């Protein structure tokens, strides 16, 4: 197996672990459990990773790479600020689904170095979102907003929406709750003139797809 194929396989195994272990503590997870979530044997897992610490380090690298994804956070020629906002909404949804608050708390107590990587990635994303909101306001597309509070709303509200007990308590489906939250946020952020011309077809595909793929893992 060449190095590129090996790296690809390692990334796929880490991704499977993150997807399937979102409810569990990675820090306290045994090697056998990690291998199970990766869908490989323990022996095979250790052919690709030298230790549990290496696996945890790569999980954080995966998180940081997604948080700092320039395809999401940067503006490209021909891309509107509205399209960029929609990409950041998807990113917020995925971050809050795959990386619950307990994930961060685990690493804060277990490994300060890895936790620092988490904080650095969060700060990188914050600065780029702050720039996006500032640019949108300058263009007259967005209302001026407090970036820190807007991001905090995503963390608090999306995590509650992704909690099945909240949905049951309020008689909501996950799909309706996500659509309602998206509508609420964009109406707080985007001026009416641009709401009237905004193309939400991509979000209308994203949310049902997310629900179909992930609702049973909540």
Where are each of the predicted segments found?
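C-terminal peripheral helix-coil segments that are non-catalytic and often amphipathic
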Residues: 134, 171-218
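Hydrophobic alpha-helical connector segments
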Residues: 58, 69-99
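Basic, helix-initiating cap at the start of DNA-binding domains
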Residues: 1-40, 54
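Short hydrophobic/aromatic patch on the recognition helix
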Residues: 38-49
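Amphipathic alpha-helical packing segments from all-alpha helical-bundle domains
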Residues: 113-139, 148-163, 180
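Short amphipathic alpha-helical segment with a characteristic S/N-K-E followed by hydrophobic residues
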Residues: 51-57, 66
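Conserved hydrophobic residue
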Residues: 26-27, 138, 142
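Amphipathic alpha-helical segments used for helix-helix packing
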Residues: 93-116, 130-131, 197-202
